[in-house]
Amino acid sequence: MRVLLSNDDGVHAAGLKALAEAFHGDEVWVVAPDREQSASSHAISLHRPLRLLEVAPRWYAVDGTPTDAVYMGLNLVLRDARPDVVVSGVNHGPNLGNDVLYSGTVAAAMEGALLGVNAIAVSLAAPPPHDFGEAARFAAALARQVVARPPPAPVLLNVNVPPGPVRGYRFARLGRRTYGNEVVEKTDPRGRKYYWIGGEGRVHNEDIPGSDCNTVLLERLAAVTPLHLDGTHDPMFQELRSWTVPGYEKEPAP
């Protein structure tokens, strides 16, 4: 099995190294950002050149985003030998619920799926110090199942693993979690104001049975969530069909 690994914590991150070890015996390639890129979402570098450095055999660093890394991995490094699966992680912390909208880990996997390769994002929902081995082994086992039973279209799976041994798993829906929506104002030594956003330590997870949040944080099971690349909201799409925009014709003839 040929595997492309990436992440958003950087090419030297412990979670990435654990993931590579979990795929021991497979043909493993790594293309990852050269530095920390957490919460970079699906940003891609279109207005500056990128540099690619081979830091070890089949192990590359890109001075860009997680999306850049997977794009380079699939369209340059492995252009003539496509991988069977892309795996992103192991992230240093959870990517539950609406975290997936901000996560560079998830975005790296999503780029793989967009480019036609089955992909998995895996995160360890635990505070430091981290032991990534169990999460990495679970992701490797899941990847083998994806390759053995390939879906008709590229699949994107978001995996969150609780700390400790994985006693089981659930296929779960995305939950909802919110953070402290505060802006902290400070002043630098030159008297100029600067700001921190997002808040710290004020995460609220809605109690939704069967959600990834409940599965991982309350039941201590691994959560596997299939994510959909089509962002159209179908119920609202049907509702909009009954709307009119004053002064404009709907669906005019050519």
Curated annotation (Swiss-Prot):
UniProt-listed Enzyme Commission number(s): 3.1.3.5
Entry's cofactor comment: Binds 1 divalent metal cation per subunit.
Top-level taxon in the UniProt lineage: Bacteria
Catalytic activity, as annotated: a ribonucleoside 5'-phosphate + H2O = a ribonucleoside + phosphate
List of residues binding a divalent metal cation: 8-9, 38, 91
Cofactor(s) required, per the database record: a divalent metal cation
Molecular-function GO term, any one: metal ion binding
Compartments reported by the entry: Cytoplasm
InterPro entries, A to Z: SurE (IPR030048), SurE-like_Pase/nucleotidase (IPR002828), SurE-like_sf (IPR036523)
Top enzyme category: hydrolase
Main location per the UniProt record: cytoplasm
Pfam families according to UniProt: SurE
GO terms for cellular component: cytoplasm
Keywords: Cytoplasm, Hydrolase, Metal-binding, Nucleotide-binding
Family indicated by similarity: Belongs to the SurE nucleotidase family.
Function in brief: Nucleotidase that shows phosphatase activity on nucleoside 5'-monophosphates.
Protein's name in the database: 5'-nucleotidase SurE
Organism, as annotated: Anaeromyxobacter dehalogenans (strain 2CP-1 / ATCC BAA-258)
Lineage: Bacteria, Pseudomonadati, Myxococcota, Myxococcia, Myxococcales
Gene from which the chain derives: surE
